[in-house]
Every structure is written in C-alpha cells, then in structure tokens.
UniProtKB/Swiss-Prot annotation:
Location(s), subcellular: Cytoplasm
Source lineage: Eukaryota, Sar, Alveolata, Apicomplexa, Aconoidasida
GO molecular function, one term: structural constituent of ribosome
InterPro entries in the cross-refs: Ribosomal_uS2 (IPR001865), Ribosomal_uS2_CS (IPR018130), Ribosomal_uS2_euk (IPR027498), Ribosomal_uS2_euk/arc (IPR005707), Ribosomal_uS2_flav_dom_sf (IPR023591)
Species: Plasmodium falciparum (isolate 3D7)
The protein's name in its UniProt record: Small ribosomal subunit protein uS2
Gene expressing this chain: RPS2
One Pfam family per UniProt: Ribosomal_S2
Length: 263
C-alpha cells in the first residue's frame, strides 16, 4: 500500500518521524545503543537510524498481536509527556495503561490491591520506568521499551530506538505502534489510512488551556446594547421617586431661628 505521493508505508512513517524529531538522540551514548546510531552531529548529539527504528516498531507490533488477550499487555509511562499517549494506545488496542507513578510491587507483591500479572510490558523510558522494568525481570515478563541513545538496555527484550523525551516523538511512536497493531489484527484495512490523528496522542498542559481560556474571556468584547438593556431593566427605587419626602415633609424646626434664651 502506498499513499497518493507514491511513498511506501516505510517511507511515509520515516517522513513523519523526521517531522516529530524521532531521530534526535542525546549527547550521551550507551554502549549497547551504538548499533542504532547513524552518526553524531557537530554539537555532539547522536542521530538515530530511523530505518532500524521502523524495523523494531514492526517487530514490537507483531509481538503485541501474538498475545491473544489485549488486556494482558500493560503499557507504562512515568514521564508526563507520555501519559496521554499510553492512555490513547490502551484505548485503541485494549491494553492496560499505567500513567504516572508506578506502585512498587505491582508485579511481585501479591498482597497489594494493584497486583497484576501481564504477559507483556511496554515502557516509555527504561530509566524513568526502571522500577517496572526491574519487577518484570523478577516475574519473567518480556519488556518492550522506547530507548534513547543513553537508555540502559538491562532487562529490555525489544528496544525501539527513538527520542523518548520529546512529547511529539512519544506521541508519534505510540500512534505508529497502535496503527500497526490494528493493521495486523484486521481492525482497519491497510488500503485506508487510520482516521485518528497523531494530535490525539499528544500531551497537553492543562495550565496552558486555563490561561488560554482566561485570555479569551478577557478579550471577548461586550455588546453595547446589552449594557444599555442591563441598566434599563433595573427598576427605580420607590423612595427616590417620592417627592414629598424632600419637599413636603421638611422639618419646620429648622426654618425658625433659635431664640437667644435657649443658648
């Protein structure tokens, strides 16, 4: 299947990765991540080979589809930029999402209420999600991880090399992974593009929305006729219309001068 521009699915996906800066790594390099690095820029930033990123993405999607029950897949993100992405990924694929703090012992301590026994674990960052990766090793659970150039690969079975620190990159990677899973399951045909936009997986700061709404309320002009009608609708006070209170009921004692004997 190719798009209107004549691009293959691989070329189209890599083009989106370039736009979302998936290829931008870090200045540090893990020894086991050298195989996924294409080159090093002049500023010291390592550039990730997107061809290998696409290959690992396809492999990860096939592993996810091989699990019969989608609820046995747990996707984790302790990084705030990946919280919305994992929730959307779980929504469209049927997996379980854990966004935010990981409760220690979820995979090893059967006493706690949140104990779970998944068959596959997907993490956004092996460094920030180190607790879940460590517990998966104890429970013999395979791990798929989005790995940057400086990410440790200990206890990671499938490493998808990408920029796991940018919100655009994280959103696109989970979007591509969810799209490929739905393609392999036959939920959506490969001849048609997925009608869900990448923006749905993109993290949004709630504080920015509040500030934007406040700015819109302040900049919204008020119609002059509404202001006039507001004041016109107010009923006049009755005590203001009573002229006798000001004219007829004047205290007569103030009119007559005070006699000198009273002083």
């Amino acid at each position: 299947m190719s798009n209107k521009k004549g691009q293959s699915p691989k070329e189209e996906s890599i083009a989106k990765m370039l736009i979302c800066k998936v290829h931008i790594g870090t200045k540090n390099l893990e020894n086991k991540m050298k195989r996924y690095v294409y080159t090093r820029a002049k500023d010291g930033v390592h550039i990730i080979n997107l061809a290998k990123t696409y290959e690992k993405l396809q492999l990860a999607a096939r592993i996810i589809v091989a699990i019969s029950n989608p609820a046995d897949v747990v996707v984790v993100s302790a990084r705030p930029f990946g919280s919305r992405a994992v929730l959307k990924f779980a929504q469209y694929t049927g997996a379980q999402a854990i966004a935010g703090r990981w409760t220690p012992g979820m995979l090893t301590n059967q006493i706690i209420q949140k104990f779970t026994e998944p068959r596959l674990l997907i993490v956004t960052d092996p460094r920030t999600d180190a607790q879940s990766v460590k517990e998966s090793a104890y429970a013999n659970i395979p791990v798929i991880a989005l790995c940057d150039s400086d990410s440790p690969l200990e206890h990671v079975d499938i490493a998808i090399p990408c920029n796991n620190k940018g919100k655009e990159s994280i959103a696109l990677m989970y979007w591509l992974l969810a799209q490929e899973v739905l393609y392999l399951k036959g939920v959506i045909p490969r001849s048609e593009p997925w009608n869900v936009m990448v923006d749905m997986f993109l993290w949004r700061d709630p504080e920015q929305f509040e500030l934007k709404n406040l700015a819109n309320e302040e900049n919204t002009p008020t119609a002059p006729h509404l202001i006039e009608n507001q004041y016109a609708a107010e009923a006049p006070y009755d005590e203001w219309t009573k002229k006798e209170e000001w004219n007829d009921n004047t205290n007569e004692d103030w009119k007559n001068p005070i006699a000198a004997e009273e002083w």
